[in-house]
A protein has these predicted regions:
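C-terminal amphipathic helix plus adjacent low-complexity
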Residues: 1-24, 154-194
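Conserved catalytic-core segment of nucleotide-activated headgroup transferases in glycan assembly
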Residues: 2-87
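Flexible loop/turn segments at secondary-structure boundaries
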Residues: 36-40, 75-80, 104-107, 123-125, ...
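Short, structured coil segments at secondary-structure junctions
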Residues: 64, 91-93, 111, 129-130
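Nucleotide-activated donor-binding/catalytic signature segment of Leloir-type glycosyltransferases, i.e.
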Residues: 83-99
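Short acidic-hydrophobic, aromatic-tinged amphipathic segments that line or gate anion-handling sites
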Residues: 96-100, 147-162
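A donor-sugar binding/catalytic signature common to diverse glycosyltransferases
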Residues: 100-148
Length: 194
């Protein structure tokens, strides 16, 4: 059964039954990709693969003394993705690890400073909730100005530094443009019909 909100996952990331209380502070939320997905589906990214991305990102954030939370991808059911996620959890035990079943609303209610995803739909969700979204490379929202998209690894870490320092020029209330983007990407896009 496919979720009517997002046609590639089974469960809604906004399930109100899963509004578990998150006790810890969250400065930055990292949304893991499905590690079996193509890392360069939208063009050549600034990292070679998801492994390089997540490890360099976490190390950089740790050096800035931030409260970091990581949420696994809702489609994390493929064995190789689970194995890699478990290796990350063992390596970064001090971080807050959130289940894929926790509603994104519970996360957004914690008001993190910013959120990071390689190219996930959560980027427009973050912007919708007025939380700074930072991608790690090409993504479906590059034509819009509500997601920060780097062109190089150096620029990626500059964007994160500026987000930490509250120096990114993030204009809030992009709801109309986000609705347009959502329509074009999920409802009007014929790729899913073929």
């Amino acid at each position: 059964k496919i979720n009517p909100e997002l046609n590639y996952i089974k469960k809604s990331p906004y399930n109100k039954k899963n509004l578990f209380k998150i006790d810890k502070k969250i400065d930055v939320i990292i949304f893991l990709p499905d590690f079996s997905d193509a890392p360069h589906i939208y063009g050549k990214g600034v990292f070679n693969d998801f492994s390089e991305w997540i490890q360099e990102t976490v190390e950089f954030l740790k050096s800035n003394n931030l409260s970091i939370a990581i949420k696994e991808h809702p489609n994390n059911w493929i064995y190789s993705s689970k194995v890699f996620k478990n290796k990350l959890k063992n390596k970064y035990k001090a971080l807050t690890w959130l289940s894929k079943d926790i509603s994104n609303l519970a996360i957004f209610n914690k008001k993190p400073i910013f959120g990071i995803s390689p190219h996930g739909t959560v980027l427009h969700e973050l912007a919708y909730h007025n939380i700074i979204p930072v991608a790690s490379g090409p993504n479906p929202y590059m034509s819009y100005n509500f997601v920060f998209t780097p062109k190089s690894k150096k620029e990626y870490f500059v964007l994160i530094t500026k987000a930490i320092q509250n120096k990114l020029n993030f204009k809030k209330n992009h709801k109309e443009k986000i609705a347009e983007c959502y329509y074009m990407y999920f409802l009007h896009n014929g790729d899913y019909i073929k």
